[in-house]
């Protein structure tokens, strides 16, 4: 590993990635320029630019008219797609003041979970965890994206259920697609957002965009930074992010978009949890940080580059090409397990697992597709065919989590990492994944109101594991599989659709990049889902509602041991059934309501575990609540003054597979008020966790929980000019 990376700076890499992108994109663009008839179809490129600009949600919470990318690449709206999708607009993110992606997605129907130092992607949907994360439609490794400032996104899409037909190996429960803010030729205001909150926390966002050269080039640029603390001693988080994009109108038919995103993050003394006292949360320990080492940190950096060519060759044929590159590095240096029961002295706590580890991740790939929009046998038909090539390299370093010591429970000693262990990280495994895939979709209109969406993907993947250390070992495996989806959609009216869908998927039994040598020969997990639902607008488009019922099943899977997160247990079959409902109302210009609720009945069907061995059949998986619900209401007494309240309910869940340790349900309340001083300047105040409720939202070890942040206040100013 280079000294530059150890110093929290990603080393400069050769520019051949950028050159490759341009070579892939520009030859096609040149053809488009040559073939362009500017008099006959000059409006077509203008229309495409308008579509690109308006594909983001225009209202705060309504999303059925939005063109989505997460469930189909055919350019269908949410209403037209026979899958359950939620779209969170940039306006909603800003109005709620979401500081993180966790805050953005946790209010989506059925979403539950947490992002924490030890469980960076422990979100669940439809009874399964984790979820997949995509950036502009590309499934992206690592957890750095989840730490990034959400003000850089034009919208965030949430798909419930498998996404394998679009992305190959993908989480069964659902996927989240982060769509960056895009350049357009229409005027975009200059944006300034600043917030000052509890614990001397600050955050800043600057944004601008618009035309560089009339009808030739446009840009979008966003810059953000934050420095925040919490009620937990010594914990401090700093983030920096710059993202930008250039849009070139190569001809009346061709558009080229180049985007670059750079993220930096460092958290000193991250909170790893609080030890339980006789199985209960002790309020007096709420603010104590047992990971108070003088050099404790988590730091990461990531760079993403994408080049997208959209060529509208004829009114019936489109070519799309997307080159993508991602490089991320993240390192940890912490002590993370705390047990009162293991201490030999009264009034002390044992802390162990002094971990020094790092992830080094690189992904490069290219996706190309052709879209045909022409009648078939007299019926409207839209068809896409394409291929996807990618290569990912992953290097994992660890010190094995040694070290143990006892410290006073009320005042743990603050010392350096080396006092707990002298063991430093070393290479553990190097994994390479080479993948190619072919995919197709077809939306066939059987009648004016009845359509059928079919999707098929073939995936071929070569994996190579190099296990490093005292006993070096190599292993290789080839995976080849096909997945498909089929779903009819029927328009009861112009604004109300009902649909059904059956989709299959594949998922690794565990993360392929963290398999042990003995696990590399295991088959992939099989995923199947049935879904029926309805979605529509009503009351003169003042209301939107969605309803989905589903059954989701996985065979031959692994689940993390609830008491030992680094240990995996084999499960033969797990099934989840449930219902999800969302409602959005705009009764008047002064009122806006958004509500959703989800019931999840997740159970193990075939699972034996524990010591001694026993059946867990019929038990609920750990960390999966049965009910979740969200309600957001906004009232404007005047045109300038707004009041917002948000309620969130998460039902009880178990922290173990035996269903013996139960985590109680909780309800939180957030309040906000804002005032538009002038047409360009607005100010406001937010209060999070108004009731200062004390509750645990996750258990990382048997006798250790993550306690939710205490009440916080934030004042903010937003300027648009």
Tell me what each language-model feature is.
Residues 305-328, 352-467, 546, 594:
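Face-selective signature of the C-terminal outer-membrane beta-barrel domain
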Residues 151-154, 165-244, 250-254, 303, ...:
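Outer-membrane beta-barrel translocator/receptor signature
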Residues 247-251, 255, 361, 380-384, ...:
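Structural signature of Gram-negative outer-membrane beta-barrels, strongest in the C-terminal barrel
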Residues 449, 542, 551-553, 570-657, ...:
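Gram-negative outer-membrane beta-barrel transporters
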Residues 649-656, 674-721:
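C-terminal beta-signal and adjacent terminal beta-strands/loops
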Residues 46-187, 532:
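Acidic, small-polar-rich N-terminal luminal/periplasmic segments of exported/outer-membrane proteins
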Residues 308-312, 316-324, 328-336, 491, ...:
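Membrane-embedded beta-barrel scaffold of Gram-negative outer-membrane proteins
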Residues 226, 230, 243-249, 253-312, ...:
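Acidic/polar loop-and-plug regions of large Gram-negative outer-membrane beta-barrel proteins
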